Curated annotation (Swiss-Prot):
This is Glycerol-3-phosphate dehydrogenase [NAD(P)+]. Belongs to the NAD-dependent glycerol-3-phosphate dehydrogenase family. Sn-glycerol 3-phosphate binds at residues 109, 138, 140, 194, 247, 257-259. HAMAP family: NAD_Glyc3P_dehydrog (MF_00394). Pathway: Membrane lipid metabolism; glycerophospholipid metabolism. The active site is at residue 194. Keywords: Cytoplasm, Lipid biosynthesis, Lipid metabolism, NAD, NADP, Nucleotide-binding, Oxidoreductase, Phospholipid biosynthesis, Phospholipid metabolism. GO terms for biological process: carbohydrate metabolic process; glycerol-3-phosphate biosynthetic process; glycerol-3-phosphate catabolic process; glycerophospholipid biosynthetic process. PROSITE patterns: NAD_G3PDH. Its EC number is 1.1.1.94.
């Protein structure tokens, strides 16, 4: 079946819209679908996502499609950009409408709620083994991406042909450098754990601990990410790249990050519900914390920063007490013997 679009993007929030704008700015015919018909009608009329990316006009190659069946019929390349807690649900909706030659990539960052499973496992459970899968991840704030400010990301998947296609599709000499990576697991994990550590960095700054503490927390957070990744068979080198260190530093240090701002509010004394309300959008790290903590416990991986953030979010511990517990942990070597 011939494509009438180069790619269909599922998810018309800030990040899905930004990726659609970036793709269309490359000259690729891009369809953008979202679950809310009223929102989609507004996007089509305004030629701009005023709710999430105000003032950034859609390129001519970007089209809005409110009908999921039509959106999925238009292209065999499907980019899913929805919150992690509805990732499986969206795939269930899409499954009977997918073309037989469909290829699925996602930019969703997180794990499956409750179980802590990787999204590749969710996708395989829903879709079976028929379709090539891929993930893209890296330091990409939606607004900067949509504005055409330069950054770099990584792409990994189950099929090298599809991965290489995505590199070519997404890459732009002016705005986006794209690296191929063969670590499918590592790229997915980095996007989930960095959200958790960003909440911790925000809490640290909210308490008033300063730049030294923030940097120490980021560094030890990277250690926790690498530990968990290696336990799942990921390549430790992945976490020194765009989907690891790159995304971690970005999310922990800039107030465009909803996760960091959520942590800041907690560190300044807000309760969890009030802090979430202040953000006004999905704070992926809130759910990610429980998911990552669950996964680490199941695998027996030590993640003390993640554990303390979990206790703040779900057990009512104060950020100050969490910091005290981290600082009073047993002394040990930074590089334990292998």
């Amino acid at each position: 079946m011939k494509n009438s679009a180069d790619i269909t993007v599922l998810g018309a929030g800030s990040y899905g819209t930004a990726l659609a704008i970036s793709l269309a700015s490359n000259g690729h015919k891009t369809l953008l679908w979202g679950h809310d018909p009223v929102h989609m009608q507004t996007l089509a009329q305004d030629k701009c996502n005023q709710a999430f990316l105000p003032g950034i006009a859609f390129p001519d190659c970007l089209q809005i499609e409110a009908d999921l069946a039509k959106a999925l019929a238009a292209s065999n390349n499907v980019l899913v950009v929805v919150p992690s807690h509805v990732f499986g649900t969206v795939l269930e909706q899409a499954k009977p409408l997918l073309r037989s030659d469909a290829r699925i990539v996602w930019a969703t960052k997180g794990l499956e709620p409750e179980t802590g499973r990787l999204l590749q496992d969710v996708a395989r459970d829903v879709l079976g083994e028929q379709y090539p899968l891929a993930v893209l991840s890296g330091p990409t704030f939606a607004k900067e991406l949509a504005m055409g400010l330069p950054t770099a990301i990584s792409v990994a998947g189950t099929c090298p042909t599809f991965t290489n296609y995505l590199v070519e599709l997404l890459h732009s000499p002016k705005r986006l450098r794209v690296y191929a990576n063969d670590d499918f697991t590592g790229l997915q994990l980095g996007g989930a754990v960095k959200n958790v550590i960003a909440i911790g960095a925000g809490m640290s700054d909210g308490i008033g601990f300063g730049a030294n503490a923030r940097t120490a927390l980021i560094t030890r957070g990277l250690v926790e990410l690498t530990r968990l990744g290696e336990a799942l068979g990921a390549n430790a080198a992945t976490f020194m790249g765009m989907a690891g260190l790159g995304d971690l530093v970005l999310t922990c240090t800039d107030n465009q990050s909803r996760n960091r701002r959520f942590g800041l509010a907690l560190g300044k004394g807000c309760d969890v519900m009030t802090a979430q309300a202040e953000i006004g959008q999905v704070v992926e790290g809130y759910r990610n914390t429980k998911e990552v903590f669950t996964l680490a416990k199941r695998l027996g991986v030590e993640m003390p920063i993640t554990e303390q953030i979990y206790q703040v979010l779900y057990q009512g511990k104060s950020p100050v007490d969490a910091a005290k517990e981290l600082l009073s942990r047993e002394k040990k070597s930074e590089t334990p013997a292998q």
